[in-house]
Amino acid sequence: ATKSTRPEGASTWWAQGGIAVARQNPEPFQRDIETASSDTSDPAAVEVLTQHADAAVRDVLIDTLNVDFDAGGDGAPYDYGREAAHSADRILHVDASTGKHIHEPFLAYLAEHPKVQIADGTAAVGLLAEEGRVRGARLASNGTIAPVYAGATVLATGGIGALYGHSTNPAGATGDGIAMAARAGADTADMEFVQFHPTVCIADGDPFLISEAVRGEGAVLRDAQGERFMPPVHADAELAPRDVVARAVERAHERTGQVVLDVSSFDFETTFPDLQALCESHGVDPSTGIPVVPAEHFLCGGIEVDTRGRSSLEGLYAVGECARTGVHGANRLASTSLLEGLVWGLRAGAAAPGHEQPAARSEEAVQTGDPPAPDTLQSAYDRIQAIMDEHVGLRRTPEGLARAQDALRTLAAEVEPHAAPDAPPVGHELQSACTVALLVAEAAAQNEVSVGCHYVTDPGDAGDPVAA
């Protein structure tokens, strides 16, 4: 079941850079993941990811879906790229639109599968849970909300980009799965670790990602005076971990008024034709520098799961960005999100059939009521985004986080009537956004240690952005 009716509604579609593999050498890959996380990732989870990476990509993406990854030079079958904080070339890619090229054949495969039914335009608005057990979900479609019973329920609902003013996520990324799981009593973890991508172009007000692969190819960041600012900040300069680069970009933007990505050191149009076309469609000429700012990109936390995707509730699984597997810790290494979703998806898929199908109850379907007025919805989202941008963004203060919690609790109370049992999906979606925003703010307030994506500072502090 997916609330979207378009492939672009899935986060996978939007992934650009690529998918990392171990190349038969998982130990250095594991070290890179742990280093990028400031040694906050779960070593057992990282080991699962790196040990299963090659087989998962080969068996599913290459042998089953026939994803045509870019070839290397001199007849090499693959062009392995390198991105920030990777110590080796290990990233498979298709131009700079890898997610789309994975997602399209995946949907085609599912469409032909005799045991898969895709219900699009169908939103999950709540879980059927009691006594620590999930028995299915309540699904809304065509003006009706009805229970669907299942031995296992797998959440793969993506991220939380809609909670921020600028994001690289699809518009529907309101954290629905995390909110439903939390309301049902599932454990969440690491919710304060919201990763901001350092290079997002919003030239015409419509954000679009400039892949990390561009910096891996040699692009550099310059301020409004044309000066590079990353070399003094970190030894790896533009290829430092994302949290470091994002804060440095924000500082440089505040200091000089603009930051551009200079791609003049290589043939950008030939190397990244999809990105060239995307820039041109937004009125940006890459040859003169691509204006960039940080924007919300990825939630490293989520529904706490084990190495099989099992949550704290019996019968409930989570995979992908809505899950907190422990792989990322405080900061995600580039090009590991597609891999995490693939590996945990396979493992959850193998474990989920082991649950007994629950008996259906006599609960009846209900007709949905009228949705909130469009201006009511827009006003609520505007308030959520303003709160999160100001107080729960790249740099946070204890006072700001306290104000954010107060404001979000007030808003949640106002929104609650719009999420009644017979409310249409947009009301439940808004409630989910409020729920998850508050989870992020509360987790951030409880963690006084600056690490990775979570950077806490005193008001007015202008210290070194890599102090965390």
Regions found by a protein language model. Name each.
Residues 4-34, 38, 208-211:
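Conserved N-terminal glycine-rich FAD pyrophosphate-binding loop of Rossmann-like flavoproteins
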Residues 7, 14-16, 59, 68-81, ...:
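Glycine- and aromatic-enriched mobile tails/lids
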Residues 36-79:
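Rossmann-like flavin
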Residues 44-54, 89-108, 119, 167-175, ...:
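Short beta-strand to alpha-helix junction loop
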Residues 63-144, 156, 197-202, 221:
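Conserved redox-cofactor binding core of oxidoreductases
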Residues 143-152, 311-315:
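Core beta-strand elements of the Rossmann-like FAD/NAD(P) dinucleotide-binding domain
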Residues 152-208, 338, 342-344:
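Glycine-rich loop(s) and the adjacent beta-strand/alpha-helix scaffold that form part
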Residues 180, 186-288, 351:
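An anion/pyrophosphate-binding glycine-rich loop and adjacent beta-alpha core
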